[in-house]
Amino acid sequence: MEKWFIASKRADFNKIGEIFHISPVTARLMRNRSLTTVREMQRYLYGSLSDLYDSHLLKDADKGAEIIKEKIETGKKIRIISDYDVDGVSSNYILYQGLKRCGADVDYKIPDRVEDGYGINEHLIEKAAEDGIDTIITCDNGIAAAEQIAYGNSLGLTLIVTDHHDIPFQRQEDGSISYNLPSAAAVINPKQKDCPYPFENICGAVVVYKFIQVLYDLFGIDRRESEVFLEIAAMATVCDVMPLCDENRIIVKEGLRRIQHTNITGLQALIEANHLEEKKISSYHFGFILGPCINASGRLTSAKDALELLLCEDKELCRQKAEALTQLNAERKEMTANGVKAAKEYLESTGHANDKVLVVYLPNCHESIAGIIAGRMKEHYHKPVFVITRTKEGLKGSGRSIEAYHMYKEMNKIKECFDKFGGHPMAAGFSMQEDRLEEFREKLNANATLTEDDFAEKVHIDVALPISY
């Protein structure tokens, strides 16, 4: 049964409406977004790029930029290693183009989802050393790779981590928490406890967008040049499901305005391949049409295909690449539908549908769509869901959660079950050995304190509209 919640925050909505020349209903919507001051409301309604936070506030951004400047000026080779989703591809694109603008000798690698798994690993580090790379920059990954970063250090590489994921931690016997940061030359992540950046809920692409601004400042490049990356940063923000408040709202608004006349040939080709050239692009198109086409490459072939589309400047070649990604996404949709059907059958046949935390084992499912299936199952059952598949190395899984269940913290309580894991309150990924599967299921459910109220679908209502509205 649904639970309805009607927001009841109070304010003089008529007065707010008069100040900003908006209706009292819109004023109530703003108040329900926890906006209390005139300045906050002004920024919410009319925020511009001048309202974005100072990029130099990101901890280690200046330090990292100084390191990169020295590497560029001495001709050292730099390699970018990103994630394979929309945020990872977008981060890689922004970082690559920004470093090129500064004169860097730079290339990129994107881990293969099946062969490499998520994030930087020993194989990628060894390959970089063999290729004569001096410096590795991660984007949208690396914060949970302390061992891998240490290994890179031992090979004499310089490593810089840019990421936005939660910082790995351990709870001590006395109840205190110790955070496990990688020993990189610079760690740029707004979720560090001592980072003075005012807003931590930015995606990986926005982190590197900010870093490139700092680098441009150091090289004396007009930072307005970095605005060419805004439509890419906006798409990543939406596709990585960042909250559309604070500066994210400004970035997405500006990105949507600019994408109508984008100069990124590959992005324009993707818009045309999906027949959106005559439409006003919205956040819906980012999240449900354009983004999934980019994601499809990382899921089914190689995310390098999507990155090469964004970097391509030949119109005909871009058209071919964009159409291929669009077709790939159609195939992914069909695979997802079959996977969702199999997941429901599994839960009902095993009786696990009654568990508080649902663990679905689909050994023959393509690992790349496990997260999508988990999301669909969460929407259907309104419970936290983990979907696990079999790979050559063992099991891999993705989880999607509900508001009442902090997925990353719960996984941290049973970290002995995993080979690797990481994530957010609402989503996570991991690898494990097959003989830990039942232990994983049992411990998750034994620890779960969820109640029937937590499983009720929650509908948040801002205001009951007058009939005349």
Question: Locations of the language-model features?
Answer:
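A contiguous loop/helix-start segment that scaffolds small-molecule binding in enzyme catalytic cores
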Residues: H261-I264, N447-Y469
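Catalytic domains of riboflavin
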Residues: M1-K3
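Non-catalytic nucleic-acid-binding/docking modules located in mid-to-C-terminal regions
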Residues: I6
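Hydrophobic helix-and-loop "lid/oligomerization" segment in the mid-to-C-terminal part
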Residues: K9-T135, L155-G156, Q172-G175, S183, ...
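Active-site cavity-forming subdomains of large catalytic enzyme subunits
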Residues: E126-A205, Y209-L218, V228, C245
